[in-house]
């Protein structure tokens, strides 16, 4: 199934179970989604340099659940639905294509560039994926930031003013850790 990322068949089943339990029954569903267990798993995964080959069933589920906790089920179901309308030529055929296609669909569904978030998890993203998402704002307040993963600095609106032969005033905006606010430097 093209909407199932490499190595995540069991994760997809668990994800569907979480959705059904939360949406239809009104309970959290499984003890493995307990906040303490999730925190321990993520700490272990990121301490091991977020190697995608170690992206196990429950760790992969955490990747999806964090997105669900930020935006709800809507963007996830929207992103998954896209796969069922793809022409055969557009169905991802390699692991790398599957990871990159998912990041494009979920980013467009949330309205945020989730490439840095998925890169933090170790997804093998291409430059084309990053470039395709430059029109979307980066999700700068994701819960990985600071606690589990240290992102590269996000700089935007880099400008130079008052240029002379010996000096230049440079200004830019950076995101502050865990805050969706831009500050001018």
PLM region descriptions:
Residues 95-185:
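Beta/coil-rich, acidic/histidine-enriched accessory regions frequently appended to metallopeptidases
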Residues 29-31, 81, 135:
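Flexible domain-boundary/linker segments
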Residues 1-40:
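Zinc-dependent metallopeptidase catalytic helix centered on the HExxH motif
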Residues 39-130:
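Active-site-proximal alpha-helical
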Residues 1-12, 75-77, 81, 166-185:
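Proteins with a high burden of low-complexity, intrinsically disordered sequence enriched in S/T/G/P/A and R
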